[in-house]
Amino acid sequence: DKLDGQEVLFPVALPGSLWEESGRYESVGSELLRFTDRTGSKMVLGMTHEEASVQLVREYANSYAKYPFMIYQIQTKFRDEARPRAGLIRVREFTMKDAYSFHTSQEDLEQYYQRCYDAYNRIFARCGIPEVAVVKSDSGMMGGSISHEYMLLTAAGEDSIAICPECGYSANVEAAPSIVKNENTIAKEELKEVATPGTGTIEELCEFLHIPAENTAKAVVYQRNADDSYVVAFIRGDLDINETKLTNALGC
């Protein structure tokens, strides 16, 4: 409220037409719970409420004089998590405070973002929770140029973060830039076809050919949600593809 926010309460069940308009009805995966009402109209259980907030604003905030402003709610959210586990760590139904601000310029948005950032820092400090790391993160399906996560450091967690004790930089590994050392000293040879029967993994291939994993490459095939097209990504055999960075690079 000190940020001049106005509290609202959006419906849990939302018209699928709003999500179709934004494109997220198709682009969001199975985490979005979809169903139809008795008339056959598409409905969803809200995992976030961007579409609902935009619908509200475009109906009632039809004058520049009403901007900027922020609306927020504390509401039940639903996500059909593939691996719900560990109590509050990953659940299908949870309570979340979400806020949506509207501005007439990018500069005003960035200034307000900093106010929200400072407010969350004060909240955690007031609650006396010391083991909270503020890290840069990927904006995911929400998009945007910058995003932060407040992560509680615990052995029970499932995310990994990178923190530099020298400069204070911190980021989720999904968003942190990295440099791969090119230490491949393999001698160049003529291209030739080699039979590798019964080698379904990089480990089996390396054992069969008696070579290290960094001297191999693997291809991983993905299917886009939006248009069902395929993407083939190649990476060195001893590394794993960062799917978040791949998604951002492809713009999908």
What is each model feature region?
Residues D1-E81, E214, Y222-N225:
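Active-site loop/lid in soluble adenylation, ligation, and acyl-transfer enzymes
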Residues D1-R38, Y100-G140:
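TRNA-binding/sensing appendages of the translation machinery
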Residues T39-M43, Q75-F78, F102-E107, Y120, ...:
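Short C-terminal domain-edge/linker segments immediately following a structured domain
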Residues E50-Q55, E59, R85-A99, E107-C252:
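Extended, low-hydrophobicity, polar/charged segments
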